[in-house]
Amino acid sequence: MFSFTKNSIQKRQYFFTIATLVAFLWLSLAACTSAPSKKNEFKSPDEAAQALGTALKAGSNEELLAVLGPEAKELISSGDEVYDLQGRQNCLKAYDEQNRVEQDGDKFLLVIGKNDWPFPIPIVKKENGWAFDTASGKEEILNRRIGKNELDTIQTLLAIVDAQREYAMADRDGDSLLEYARKFISESGKKDGLYWTPQEGEEPSPIGELLANAQAEGYASDETLYDPWPYRGYYYRILTAQGNKAAGGPYDYIVDGKMIGGFAVVAYPAEQGNSGVMTFIVNHDGKVYQKDLGENTLELAKDMALYDPDDTWTPAQ
């Protein structure tokens, strides 16, 4: 797993270690980006499982689609290409650690890794042999993906709270004020965001680059504009004010250009219903709330200006 804060994420990782291993089972599908090929049928469930292992080791898109069938193309992306790649590598590692086929009623399951995790796509009897039933495994794969991403996002928001508190413990711009960061990525040569490129011998920034790049607006560095990409399926935005339903009532966190009154963050899925369902918010109090914003999640979350958890938001912890 990627380390994205200096200390806090190491303390939080144990909360979702098991969920991470589960995710490795389906993240291997993200390698399948080429045109679908004809689905293979095999003489036995064991042969089907061996074919999947061979395709994983080869790293071939065509071979994976040939084993899993064209339906697998719909399941190839979690919304985070970097994390998908890591997941594929760990899936292969788990397969190499241990793999076996077990019967479950009229179907067979491939079980991999030292913790005996079942691959979510069962092997079933077809007219001419045995094949992976990708269509029936779709719901399970999406449930695992969404559940994993949402658990990670809750912990990420708590880590951002820790990072903001750490940031505010020092005067970052020499104005003798302790303040929170208004953005994730600092301008070149400055420390006005939660992430900056550390110089040799310098203390690391409160968050790491991968999370910083998940800010929804993208960012500019050295006159180059970079598009945002999601962090484990989610985008993040810093909010600078709160509304009537927040504890303490409505007020701006920014006073005379300095964010000293508090902070808030919203995290929302990059692909609604695929990389996640719930949108999450948190402020300086450290309590995470969640809500399903529906099919217009991207637009609603991008337009969100206030931290304002009314009774349609429920605690996520």
Ranges and model annotations:
Residues A72-F119, L225, W229-R232, Q242-N244, ...:
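Surface-exposed, charged secondary-structure patches
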Residues Y167-N274:
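Flexible, glycine-rich surface segments
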Residues G261-Q317:
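C-terminal soluble interaction/assembly domains
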